[in-house]
Regions:
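Append "with occasional cross-activation on large, charged helical scaffolds in nucleic-acid assemblies
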Residues: 2-171
């Protein structure tokens, strides 16, 4: 039995290539729409917050700013999860990379979702990126901006490639 299994594995092989993360155009479009909806939802949340957050509904024991950041993180995490689900559904269960992830051989479905779908919001100690320049994370963005991209949301995937600002946010 062992010899037969080794023989099958040797003849068939079990490798993954860059084309295993290929998505059809409709999947890429759907992921792009999900990321855009997430960014729009963050903008709407920032609009609700206003300039000082005095009328913003807070959670018990949290300041308005802490509540805002938690809400934004939930929105962006949901967008990442949705785009990952789209990528997973289009990759299919017969894909070698998916088989490796689901069998536990190497990687995970989260890794595949980041390679094919969307990377999402990088976090430092459970929070969005905060440090960098004075009142902003990168000099590319206006001061005191709290939008999705301004605080590090990465809508691209590793396969599609990253913008320079996205690359810096992940480093």
């Amino acid at each position: 039995m062992t010899r037969m299994t080794i023989s099958i594995c040797t003849s068939l092989g079990f490798t993954t290539g860059i084309d295993d993360e290929d998505l059809p155009p409709e999947a890429k479009e759907e992921i792009s729409l999900i990321n855009q909806r997430g960014s729009d939802a963050v903008d709407a949340e920032l609009e609700k917050f206003g300039k000082d957050g005095r009328r913003y509904e807070t959670r018990p024991g949290r300041t308005p700013l802490e509540t805002l950041e938690e809400n934004i993180l939930m929105i962006l995490d949901e967008a990442k999860t949705e785009s990952g689900n789209v990528a997973k559904s289009f990759l299919g269960s017969d894909n070698a990379a998916v088989m490796m992830a689901t069998s536990g051989a190497r990687g995970s479905m989260d890794n595949l979702a980041m390679m094919a779908g969307s990377i999402g919001q990088p976090k430092v100690r459970g929070k969005r990126l905060e440090r960098g320049y004075q009142d902003r994370v990168l000099a590319h963005f206006p001061r005191n901006s709290k939008g999705a991209q301004e605080k590090g949301f990465v809508g691209s995937s590793f396969k599609r490639g990253l913008e320079p600002t996205e690359f810096f946010m992940l480093s």
